[in-house]
Amino acid sequence: MEHQNAVKEALNALYHHPDDTVRVHADRWLQNFQGTLDAWQVADNLLHDSSSNLETLIFCSQTLRSKVQRDFEELPPGAFQKLRQSLTTLLKKFHKGPPKVRTQISIAVAALAVHVPAADWGDGGIISWLRDEMHMHPEYVPGFLELLTVLPEETFNYKIAARPDRRRQFEKELTSQMEAALSILSACLKISELKEQVLEAFASWLRLRHGIPGTVLACHPLVHAALSSLNCDPLSEASVNVISELIHHTASPSSGGISAQTPLIQVIVPQILSLQAHLRDSSKDEEDVKAIGRLFADVGDSYVELIATGSDEPMVIVHALLEVTAHPEFDIASMTFNFWHSLQLMLTKRESYSSLGSEASIEVERNRRLHIFQPAYQSLVSLVGFRVQYPEDYQGLSYEDLKEFKQTRYAVADVLIDAALILGGDTTLKILYMKLLEANAQTGNNFQDWRPAEAILFCIWAISNYVSVVEAEVMPQVMALLQNLPQQAQLLQTACLLVGAYSKWLNAAPASVSILPSIIRILMSGMGTSEDCAAAAALAFRHTCDDCRKNLCGYFEDLFNIYCMAINGGGGYKVSAEDSLNLVEALGMVVTELPLDQAKGALEKLCFSAASPLEEAAKEDLEKKHARELTVHIDRFAFLFRYVNHPEAVAAEINKHWAIFRVIFDARPWDMRTMESLCRACKYAVRTSGRYIIDTIGEMLEKIQFHYQQHHQPCFLYLSSEVIKIFGSDPSCAVYLKNLIETLFAHTTCLMTSIKEVTARPDIADDCFLLASRCLRYCPHLFIPSPIFPALVNCAMIGITVQHREACHSILTFLTDIFDLEKSVNEEQFVRIRDNIIIPRGATITRILIASLAGALPSSRLDTVTYSLLALTRTYRLQAVSWAKESVSLIPRTALTETESTKFLQALSDIAYGADVNSLIGQVEELSDVCRRNRTVQELVQAALKPLELNLVTAPVS
């Protein structure tokens, strides 16, 4: 009674106490209570207690359901019968509700069935038991019907802590009882008030995708009951669910596919098509129309392969789907978008025609089908284009409404791409251009209402990748039209995006040189209109300079003046610091096309404009500057060094401006943001310049080493990584590179001597082990014989179970690279050193990896951990299997059975003998599933494997 009263008091506090602190405390207490062994009896008692209020009933039913799902193994052997009896009594007690309580009890019984083999329920398993209960207690049928509904749903509920073998067995038990379950449902149809509930249960059983013959379902009373309900007003939601599941059932390979289900298809499809008139009925309830649209979309998605053949009968479905697409409500129309995409793939992908054999036959059939469907896709272009038009009240749209509108536009853009792939981009462009002319004519040929024109320009933007660069009929007129648009922000923004999207066309156009100045003026206008428009214009400027760089070489001074005005805010430009980087990149691409002498002068001007503000700042107190005041200029250096592909010119500039870089390094090594920006600029300078930067690299590395030991900035590591990539194999750099990596790694290993320290510095761990992998690849001769190598392996072992995704991935990748050393460095002395380090640690590494698979790391990391274990096993073969056997033997048999561990070890042994990786993946997933099936088991496994207990050893390097 004490626990029961405590639960009631906590629930009362949770729902009724005015103090938030008290409510939070009560909620936490109740959550903790649900995990206790006492929760079984307390929840059961309170559910049977007639004085319990609704809040108590809901909480206790959820608790009991959760306990059965997750903690069934807590109960002593033989508890099943008593638990089943109690749950059955509760199901009867709540057969009329409350619905939430009845549902939770039903799920609890279904979860019990997942745990307990069919034989324990008596002959025929739970279905026969359920049938008998319904016969003996017909007054409780509604409660039992809900149980019958949730049973197949629980087959795929991974909250239930069942072993994989038992879960598969349960699915087989249910599918073998499909006929009996449908028989029970058919009998319940006679009770008219239960019809909706019966149909929902039928839909649930159909989701098992069991191969019931189409001839059987075609004349089944449950199917006919669902079809007859389609004509009800309002439409029966349960009947729609049944018909939807029947459609999916007929297309499922496990049901024999469309050919085997033809009798059923011939019954349901005509019934669905007969609903087409309702799509045009404005008096019809919107939810009913949505349900009808869903059925048409299901038919299209499920039978797309048949429809794509182009035969006459399926074309009726295509015309019906066009009608759904035409519906004014976007939520209804968009249901068909997936069909149009799937059909496009079926019509264009070569795999769809592989059975035809010869290329000639494939081409003939492909053209025949495309010809058949082109009218439908032409209609599609007209039907979706208007949906991207800004609403009249667009200025009053909330943030969420504007976000939804943008999502609508991108969804329509995808449909237009599908149409362009069927019709050809040039044909689609012509259709859209005609719409543009119509829109212009309707508004008096001067775009008084800008919204229709903007919508069509957006559509033209969407298909840009599919319009030929030699298209000469429409695009010249579109580009001419852009020059006469009114200065409206959204319209100009879309015009700028369109210019950027068609930059390749601009470059290929015969009149490119004469068009470009007017195009640049459009972009300049965009930069001064609004921030969003300026962002689009800057992006378009980048694309235009990228693709038209040769034609723009002679305009560098003009482009530079535009750039200067934009970054200084002159001319009313509204380009943000971030968007200005697009302009930097744009000019960098043009400079790349200049001859070296001219490029040096151009780059010098650009770098001077970036360096001047930094030098002015250096005259003041750099330490007091806000990071953004510096990084905005340093980032421009980074983009110039990255995109100007003149190594000698870039080297000259980094050498010239190294003095200001050095000053910033020394003044703000504590400032992560500034250091990241500075290291990024140096990284691109190193990458582009290569050996031309050799005079500066030594001092750069000295700065990195010195400041890293003081301030531990991760960016110093990734800059070092770039240096290793470029200079790692250069003998003249060997001395200071060896000093660099030993200094950096020695300091890093001192920072990360426990998992707690790795967790506190995930960025350092990430960049450290990325650098280590680079060293293995580019300078193994400096790294592997180094005394720091074994210390770094120890550090990696410490950090394997770090929860930070990128850090964990870098650590595991580094270890995998060591195990796979022969793939990149096949030198015996290095392999011997590697073995001397790994073999003494092999058992511990294997134990940590298996612990990671079994729950020490999230299941999303399974692939990365598996690959590390795979590499270890392929290198050390049976020795690795022995390590794994030793680790697996630590796991208690209550958590992992002998059979389950044997399967895993056998798969690992097969890998040692050269088997394919797929043979291991399945068993890894099984091991992971079993060991994570509930919190108790997971904690038991981790306590046995002790992934944080490292047993580190000191081994000789050679």
Curated annotation (Swiss-Prot):
Major subcellular location class: nucleus
Key words, A-Z: Nucleus, Protein transport, Transport
Any GO BP annotation: regulation of RNA splicing
UniProt GO cellular component terms: nucleus
Keyword NAD set for record: no
Keyword Protein transport (UniProt): yes
Domain Importin N-terminal residues, every copy: 26-93
Described purpose of this protein according to its UniProt entry: Functions as a nuclear import receptor for serine-arginine rich (SR) proteins. Regulates nuclear import of SR proteins that are required for proper splicing of the two resistance (R) genes SNC1 and RPS4, a crucial step for their functions in plant immunity.
Assembly and oligomerization: Interacts with RS2Z33, RSZ21, RS31A, SR34 and RAN1.
UniProt similarity note: Belongs to the importin beta family.
Protein name: Transportin MOS14
Gene assigned in the entry: MOS14
